[in-house]
């Protein structure tokens, strides 16, 4: 099965080797037929502590690293 890749914004870098990334998705509301925005936060592994708050990044699914971390940061987006 291919690994999922998501794009999001770093919202916290206070943990060692971990960043919290907010990923936003948009969908049409089934009744109102209006575009709705929902976001979810993922903890991602950042081996070199190189990403800072506000950076746009891509995260990739991986094997569990800890209780909450199942994603790793692949690259920064411009």
From Swiss-Prot:
Top-rank taxon: Bacteria
Pfam families documented for this protein: Ribosomal_S17
InterPro entries given in the database record: NA-bd_OB-fold, Ribosomal_uS17, Ribosomal_uS17_bact/chlr
Keyword annotations: Ribonucleoprotein, Ribosomal protein, RNA-binding, rRNA-binding
SUPFAM superfamilies according to UniProt: Nucleic acid-binding proteins
Ribosomal protein listed as a keyword: yes
GO-annotated biological processes: translation
GO terms assigned for molecular function: rRNA binding; structural constituent of ribosome
GO CC, one annotated term: cytosolic small ribosomal subunit
Described purpose of this protein according to its UniProt entry: One of the primary rRNA binding proteins, it binds specifically to the 5'-end of 16S ribosomal RNA.
Matching HAMAP family: Ribosomal_uS17_B (MF_01345_B)
Assembly mode: Part of the 30S ribosomal subunit.
PANTHER family: 40S RIBOSOMAL PROTEIN S11 FAMILY MEMBER, SMALL RIBOSOMAL SUBUNIT PROTEIN US17M
Similarity field: Belongs to the universal ribosomal protein uS17 family.
Protein name: Small ribosomal subunit protein uS17
Species of provenance: Rhizobium meliloti (strain 1021)
Organism phylogeny: Bacteria, Pseudomonadati, Pseudomonadota, Alphaproteobacteria, Hyphomicrobiales
């Amino acid at each position: 099965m291919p690994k999922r890749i998501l794009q999001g914004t770093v919202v916290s870098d206070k943990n060692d080797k971990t960043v919290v990334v907010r990923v936003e998705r948009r969908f049409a509301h089934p009744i109102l037929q209006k575009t709705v925005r929902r976001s979810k936060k993922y903890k991602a592994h950042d081996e070199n502590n190189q990403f800072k708050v506000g950076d746009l990044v891509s995260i990739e699914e991986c094997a569990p690293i800890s209780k909450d971390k199942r994603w790793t940061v692949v690259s920064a987006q411009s």
